[in-house]
C-alpha cells in the first residue's frame, strides 16, 4: 500500500474517527444542555428504608417534610436535618448557582422524600429481633441545639421504653463532610443484636438521563475496586449486592456533585445498589449494613461514619482521601481512560490558575508547556515529511518497475526508506501523541467543577460550554435563535483558520489524494468542533498558532 495512504489512515482517519465517536456520544443540542444542566445536577429520589432483617428489601416510605429540624449553616452549605427519622434531606450548595443569570438560585442537592426532586441520606440501626425497640423513620429525636455549624456540633438522643439510650453526634466541616458518631447505651437487662446501616435514596426520571461521555449514577469503592453502575444497569438488574466486603465508600454521583457514605473501617459490610418503582416513579438506592453486633446489658457500643454531600472539587476529594484513608475517592470524578494524563493536566491548569486567576489563561500556559515538550518530536516529524516528499519521484519509479509484484514493491520501498533513513510513520507521531492530551483537556473541561461557569474574556462566560455565538446571526447582531447545528461561533472559526494556516506552513503531502483530503480538514473540524466546550477550542486554536510559530522556526533552521 502507498505509504502516504498509510499516513492518511493513521493521521487523518484515526483522529477523525475518534472525533466522530466523541460527537456521537455527546449531546449535540448544547444550548439545551446548558439550560437543563441544573436538572441533571439536582438531586433525584429514591425511597427505601432498611427493614429488620439483613437480606430484606428496603421499603419505600412516606414522610412529610413538615418535621422538626436542625438548621445547617456553613460557608459551603445551608439546609436542615429532619429530626423525624434523622434524615439529611434538605441541602443547598451556597457557592454554586444553577446557571449564569444574575438572579440564579443556588444549587439544591437534597430534597425531602415527599417532594418532586426527592434525594436524601439516612443512617440508623436495625435488628433481626422484632422485640428490640430501635429508632425508625417515625422517631422524633431530641437535640441539644437548633443549629449545626462547623464551630458548633449537634448531639441528638432518644430513649426507648426499656431505657436503652441512642446517641448521635454530628459535626460538619467548612466544606461538605459530615461526621456522624452513633452510640448505643444498653441500660436494659437483655442483649441487643444490632446492625448499623446507611442509605442514599433518590428519585430518577427518564428526562434526566445522563450522557455517555461520563459516569452518572451509583458508584463506590468496594474491596479496593471502583464500582460504577449506570441507572440503566441497576434498572435491568434490579439489585447489585456485595456481601461481607470492605466498603470504603458508596454513593451516587452526578457530573459535578457527589453524595457518598463512608462507613466505619472497623468491619466489613454488605452493600446494595437497588432499583424500585413506586407510583410510576423510578427510585434508586445505595445502602450498606454492618454485621450483627451484640451489645450486652450495661455496655456501650459506638460506630463512626461520614457523609459527603457536595461539589466534586479535585483538591477536596484528594484531601479527604489522604486524611481519612478513603480509597479511590478522587475517582468519583470521571477522568476517563487517560486518568494518568488527565489528572496531571488538571493539576497543571489549577497551579497556574492560582497565579493568573483565569482558567482560560491557564489553558494557554499549559499548551505552551506541552508544545515545548513536544518540539523535538515535531521537528523530527517535519523533517521526515519533507524527506518523504523528496523521495516521491523515486517511489513512483519503483512503482512503475514493480507495480505487478506487490511483495517486491514493498521490499524495494522499505529498502529505500532504510537507505535514506526515513521513517514513513514519523509524520503521524505528533498527532498520535496529541490524541491523549486532547482527550485529557476535553475531560478536564467537561467533568471538573472548577471549570464549570469559569469565564475567559469577552463573550466566553463558561469554558465548559460551547461558544454561544454564531456566524449565521452575525454573532448576535441579528436577534433570532438558531438550531444547534448552526451554532458555529467565533472560536470554531478561529480554530479552522489557524488550522488552514498551519497546513500551508507544513510540507504538502506528496500523494494528491491525501493532499485533497487535508484541504478539507479545516472545514470538517469547523463543523465537528462547533459544539465542543469553548475551552477546548481555545486550546486547539492556540495550539495551531504555536504550531505555525514552531513551523516558521523550523523552516528558518533548514535554510
Swiss-Prot record:
The protein, known as: Membrane protein insertase YidC
Top-level division of the source organism's lineage: Bacteria
GO cellular component entries: plasma membrane
CDD domains to which the protein is assigned, alphabetical: 5TM_YidC_Alb3, EcYidC-like_peri
Species annotation: Rickettsia bellii (strain OSU 85-389)
PANTHER family documented for this protein: CYTOCHROME C OXIDASE ASSEMBLY PROTEIN COX18, MITOCHONDRIAL (PTHR12428:SF65), OXA1 (PTHR12428)
Pfam families according to UniProt: 60KD_IMP, YidC_periplas
Bilayer disposition of the protein: Multi-pass membrane protein
Keyword Protein transport: yes
Function: Required for the insertion and/or proper folding and/or complex formation of integral membrane proteins into the membrane. Involved in integration of membrane proteins that insert both dependently and independently of the Sec translocase complex, as well as at least some lipoproteins. Aids folding of multispanning membrane proteins.
Bilayer-spanning residue ranges: 5-25, 332-352, 355-375, 429-449, 474-494, 520-540
Entry's Gene Ontology molecular function annotations: membrane insertase activity
GO terms classed as biological process: protein insertion into membrane; protein transport
Localization terms from the record: Cell inner membrane
Alphabetically ordered keywords of this record: Cell inner membrane, Cell membrane, Chaperone, Membrane, Protein transport, Transmembrane, Transmembrane helix, Transport
Family (UniProt): Belongs to the OXA1/ALB3/YidC family. Type 1 subfamily.
Record's subunit section: Interacts with the Sec translocase complex via SecD. Specifically interacts with transmembrane segments of nascent integral membrane proteins during membrane integration.
Amino acid at each position: 500500500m502507498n505509504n502516504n495512504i498509510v499516513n492518511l489512515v493513521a493521521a487523518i482517519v484515526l483522529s477523525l474517527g475518534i472525533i466522530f465517536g466523541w460527537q456521537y456520544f455527546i449531546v449535540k443540542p448544547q444550548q439545551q444542555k446548558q439550560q437543563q444542566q441544573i436538572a441533571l445536577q439536582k438531586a433525584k429520589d429514591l425511597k427505601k428504608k432498611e427493614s429488620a432483617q439483613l437480606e430484606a428489601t428496603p421499603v419505600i416510605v412516606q414522610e412529610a417534610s413538615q418535621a422538626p429540624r436542625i438548621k445547617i449553616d456553613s460557608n459551603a452549605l445551608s439546609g436542615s436535618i429532619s429530626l423525624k427519622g434523622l434524615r439529611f434531606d434538605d441541602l443547598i450548595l451556597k457557592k454554586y448557582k444553577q446557571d449564569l443569570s444574575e438572579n440564579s438560585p443556588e444549587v439544591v442537592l437534597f430534597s425531602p422524600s415527599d417532594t418532586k426532586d426527592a434525594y436524601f441520606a439516612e443512617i440508623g440501626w436495625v435488628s433481626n429481633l422484632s422485640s428490640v425497640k430501635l429508632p425508625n423513620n417515625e422517631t422524633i429525636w431530641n437535640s441539644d441545639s437548633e443549629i449545626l455549624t462547623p464551630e458548633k456540633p449537634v448531639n441528638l438522643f432518644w430513649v426507648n421504653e426499656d431505657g436503652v439510650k441512642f446517641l448521635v453526634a454530628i459535626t460538619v466541616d467548612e466544606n461538605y463532610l459530615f461526621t456522624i458518631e452513633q452510640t448505643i447505651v444498653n441500660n436494659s437487662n437483655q442483649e441487643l443484636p444490632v446492625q448499623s446501616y446507611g442509605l442514599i435514596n433518590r428519585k430518577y426520571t427518564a428526562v434526566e438521563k445522563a450522557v455517555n461521555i461520563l459516569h452518572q449514577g451509583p458508584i463506590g469503592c468496594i474491596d479496593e475496586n471502583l464500582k460504577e453502575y449506570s441507572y440503566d444497569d441497576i434498572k435491568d438488574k434490579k439489585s447489585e449486592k456485595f456481601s461481607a466486603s470492605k466498603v470504603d465508600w458508596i454513593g451516587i454521583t452526578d457530573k459535578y456533585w457527589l453524595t457518598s457514605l463512608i462507613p466505619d473501617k472497623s468491619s466489613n459490610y454488605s452493600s446494595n445498589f437497588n432499583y424500585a418503582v413506586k407510583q410510576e416513579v423510578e427510585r434508586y438506592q445505595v445502602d450498606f449494613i454492618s454485621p450483627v453486633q451484640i451489645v450486652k446489658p450495661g455496655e456501650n457500643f459506638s460506630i463512626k461514619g461520614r457523609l459527603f454531600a457536595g461539589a466534586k472539587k479535585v483538591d477536596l476529594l484528594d484531601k479527604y482521601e489522604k486524611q481519612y484513608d478513603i480509597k479511590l475517592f478522587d475517582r468519583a470524578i470521571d477522568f476517563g481512560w487517560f486518568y494518568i494524563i488527565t489528572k496531571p493536566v488538571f493539576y497543571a491548569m489549577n497551579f497556574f490558575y492560582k497565579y493568573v486567576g483565569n482558567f482560560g489563561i491557564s489553558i494557554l500556559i499549559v499548551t505552551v508547556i506541552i508544545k515545548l515538550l513536544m518540539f523535538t518530536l515535531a521537528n523530527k516529524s517535519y523533517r521526515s515529511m519533507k524527506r518523504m516528499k523528496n523521495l516521491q519521484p523515486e517511489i513512483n519509479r519503483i512503482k512503475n518497475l514493480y507495480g505487478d509484484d506487490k511483495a517486491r514493491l514493498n521490499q524495494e520501498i522499505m529498502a529505500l526508506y532504510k537507505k535514506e533513513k526515513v521513517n514513513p510513520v514519523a509524520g503521524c507521531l505528533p498527532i498520535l501523541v496529541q490524541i491523549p492530551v486532547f482527550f485529557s483537556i476535553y475531560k478536564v473541561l467537561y467533568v471538573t467543577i472548577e471549570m464549570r461557569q469559569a469565564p475567559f474574556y469577552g463573550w466566553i462566560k463558561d469554558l465548559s460550554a460551547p461558544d454561544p455565538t454564531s456566524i449565521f446571526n452575525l454573532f448576535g447582531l441579528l436577534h433570532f435563535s438558531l438550531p444547534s447545528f448552526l451554532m458555529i461561533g467565533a472560536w470554531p472559526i478561529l480554530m479552522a483558520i489557524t488550522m488552514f494556516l498551519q497546513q500551508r506552513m507544513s510540507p504538502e503531502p506528496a500523494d494528491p489524494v491525501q493532499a485533497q483530503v487535508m484541504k478539507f480538514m479545516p472545514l470538517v473540524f469547523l463543523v465537528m468542533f462547533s459544539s465542543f466546550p469553548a475551552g477546548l477550542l481555545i486550546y486547539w486554536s492556540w495550539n495551531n498558532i504555536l504550531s505555525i510559530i514552531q513551523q516558521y522556526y523550523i523552516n528558518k533552521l533548514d535554510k
